[in-house]
Design a protein with these regions (language model features):
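N-terminal glycine-/serine-/threonine-rich beta1-alpha1-beta2 phosphate-ribose binding loop
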Residues: 2-5, 12-169, 185, 189-197
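C-terminal helical cap and adjacent loop that interface with cofactors, partners, or active-site loops
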Residues: 14-19, 33-59, 87-88, 319, ...
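Predominantly a Rossmann-like dinucleotide-binding segment in NAD(P)-dependent oxidoreductases
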Residues: 83-84, 193-199, 204-314, 334, ...
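Aromatic/hydrophobic pocket-lining residues that form π-stacking "cages" and hydrophobic walls in ligand
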Residues: 160, 187, 213, 449-450
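ADP-ribose/adenylate-binding Rossmann-like module
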Residues: 168-180
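A short catalytic or substrate-binding loop motif that flags glycine-/basic-rich loops and adjacent residues
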Residues: 264, 313-318, 326-327, 341-342
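Active-site beta-strand termini and strand-to-loop segments that position acidic
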Residues: 322-328, 352
């Protein structure tokens, strides 16, 4: 067939439009009412349309971005939840300025194990609270506790943190600090009203590579920062079906939400690189999820626990990818996948006009290698081992250099020990912590924010400004020495 140029253009245009129409006809596009109204998930959970709204500060509340307390010679600690919390007990046992005065778990074997471990290291046995679901309330009522570590299943994080602060103690809460945006606001409001710290125990901010990249960013190696990538990619299929452990409760969230269920391990460090909450702020998020396949397939193939989970229906897509836009226009990609076979990765990437870093394995490219005395030919290649070693020697974080030897053998490559050392030392000296309740709320809010975006056809959803405007004047996180 002979088609003139003008006819060809019309033909291609018509074909393209027809293709678009066919594609759209096959898509599930949410209507306007669905996008703007409340969303009800299959389990009955309702996500309101105004979750991205910044709420006003109530009378009697004061900001806590620079909260300091009276210096103390010794910080008195209690730990609730002694599966994950055992690591915190052991970390505190290695700090001469910290004392674990009480431990708590519903399971007696875990309480005994934690008390034994501390007594063996320090020669003094902490009080034990165990056996019943609400025994922790007696612990937080004690008058001889400064800080309560909360390392329980997620549903207990917020009620325990609120009660802890109401009782005049600082709450150190495991990740994520909360699941819903409403609960994030409860943490913020209670911290401001009681003037007590509510810290998210994001240990990944204190890994060797994370501290290295933070120092590179603060020293200007990256130039002007513009993009970051992070994730929690971890094959947890066997863990999710393990009895007597986190599998007892963690799998439940795969039945309830379709979004990023565990954002903070990746997001916390890159938020600190970018100064989010301190000179920049989360603005909105767009999220997409793949189909749910992996967990169901694993369950059907393995029939864990003699097939007792056969009737369970999982809702969360295998891979969730969310993109966050900041107030300064920078972007962050956040991913979550715990149900497919893959090596572990948090991606941990940072990009700027002067350099790019990607982790797993650690790689760095710099725009002007000669500026740092490197052999590299330029930005089109990753630094070789010799150049990377040179950069680490120049820019290793002072906190890591100071504590590397003491942290060796600690949980998660030493980051658990440094996490406790840093924040308890800040309390001891009476200075502000590296992280505050606004970080805990913003990082944790991604769970419900991403779920609403997915449920409304990947529409943008605003992220609340939990600082209520303070981010505009707060200084970036400094380098801890």
């Amino acid at each position: 067939m002979n088609i003139s140029n003008s006819s060809r253009r019309e033909f291609l245009k018509a074909s393209a439009l027809a293709g678009v129409g066919a594609t759209l006809a096959g898509c599930s596009t949410p209507n306007e009412a669905h996008v703007k109204g409340a969303v009800t998930l299959p389990t009955g959970i309702v996500i309101q349309p105004d979750i991205g709204r910044t709420r006003p500060r109530h009378a009697g509340q004061k900001p806590v971005h620079d909260l300091t307390t009276t210096p103390q010679e010794k910080i008195r600690v209690a730990v609730i939840g002694l599966n994950r919390g055992l690591t915190h007990v052991e970390s505190c046992a290695g700090l001469d300025f910290a004392e674990v005065v009480a431990v708590c778990d519903i399971r007696e074997d875990r309480s005994k194990r934690a008390a034994d471990a501390y007594e063996k290291k320090r020669g003094k046995r902490p009080a034990i609270y165990q056996g019943t679901e609400h025994i922790w309330e007696q612990l937080v009522a004690r008058e001889d506790i400064d800080v309560v570590y909360i390392a329980t299943p997620w549903e207990w994080h917020v009620p325990m943190a609120l009660r802890t602060m109401e009782r005049g103690k600082h709450a150190f809460v495991e990740v994520s600090a909360a699941v819903t945006v409403d609960d994030c606001w409860k943490l913020v409001d209670t911290s401001e009203r009681t003037q007590k710290h509510c810290l998210i125990l994001e240990n990944c901010c204190y890994g060797e590579n994370e501290l290295f990249v933070l120092n590179l960013a603060r020293e200007g190696v990256f130039g002007e920062l513009n993009h970051a990538e992070c994730a929690y990619l971890h094959d947890l299929r066997d863990v999710l079906f393990s009895l007597g452990s986190e599998g007892d409760w963690r799998r439940e969230y795969h039945k309830q939400y379709d979004g990023n269920l565990y954002p903070t391990h990746g997001l916390g460090p890159v938020a600190q690189y970018l100064g989010l909450g301190r000179g920049d702020q989360f603005k909105y998020l767009v999220s997409v999820s793949s189909p749910e396949v992996g967990l169901t397939k694993y369950r059907n193939a393995k029939q864990p626990n003699k097939g007792k989970h056969a009737a369970e229906k999982y809702f969360c897509g295998d891979m969730n990818t969310s993109i966050v836009k900041s107030e300064l226009g920078r972007t962050i990609m956040i991913q979550h996948d715990v149900v497919n076979p893959r090596p572990y990765s948090r991606i941990n990437a940072l990009c700027g006009t002067g350099a790019t870093f990607f982790d797993y394995p650690a790689r760095l490219a710099v725009d002007e290698p000669k500026m740092f005395g490197l052999k590299s030919s330029g930005p089109h290649e990753w630094l070789d081992d010799a150049d990377m070693k040179m950069m680490r020697e120049k820019f290793s974080h002072p906190l890591w250099r100071k504590l590397e030897e003491k942290a060796a053998g600690g949980g998660h490559g030493g980051m658990d020990f440094i996490l406790s050392y840093r924040h308890l030392d800040c309390l001891r000296r009476g200075v502000s912590l590296d992280s505050n309740v606004y970080d805990a709320a913003a990082w944790s809010s991604i769970i419900e924010i991403s779920s609403r975006s997915v449920a409304t056809g990947s529409t943008p959803v605003n992220i609340p400004d939990f600082t209520r405007g303070l981010w505009k004047t707060m200084r970036p996180l400094g380098i801890a020495s």
